[in-house]
């Protein structure tokens, strides 16, 4: 197993977890880009959004619902940003789908 996020799911690498269920794990990003920066990952390896198919509909919806729950639990009442980076040009740096929840400061547009 070479995927760092799969190793986190397996408990081989520690993470500061904030939420977990049978389908996903949420934890603090080790290189935060906002005062609150949480990653949500599916427990099943899925390389990116580009590789998602019809069998992933429920999982993707679940991740978004859990992202909103995490934002509420983290006190992001004034707003937050949800990001899924896909592929090298999209800024994806880990080949395991992950949802960023960022907040705690004004999030400007365009992002960069």
Which positions does each model-derived feature cover?
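HIT superfamily nucleotide-processing domains
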Residues: 1-112
């Amino acid at each position: 197993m070479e995927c760092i996020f799969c190793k986190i799911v397996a408990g081989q690498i520690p993470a500061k977890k904030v939420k977990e269920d049978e389908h996903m794990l949420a934890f603090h990003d080790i290189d935060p880009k906002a005062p609150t920066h949480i990653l949500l990952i599916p427990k099943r390896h899925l390389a990116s959004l580009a590789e998602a198919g019809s069998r992933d509909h429920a999982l993707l919806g679940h991740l978004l619902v859990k992202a909103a729950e995490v934002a509420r639990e983290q006190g992001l009442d004034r707003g937050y940003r949800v990001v899924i980076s896909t592929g090298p040009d999209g800024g994806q740096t880990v080949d395991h789908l992950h949802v960023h929840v960022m907040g705690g400061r004004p999030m400007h547009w365009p992002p960069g």
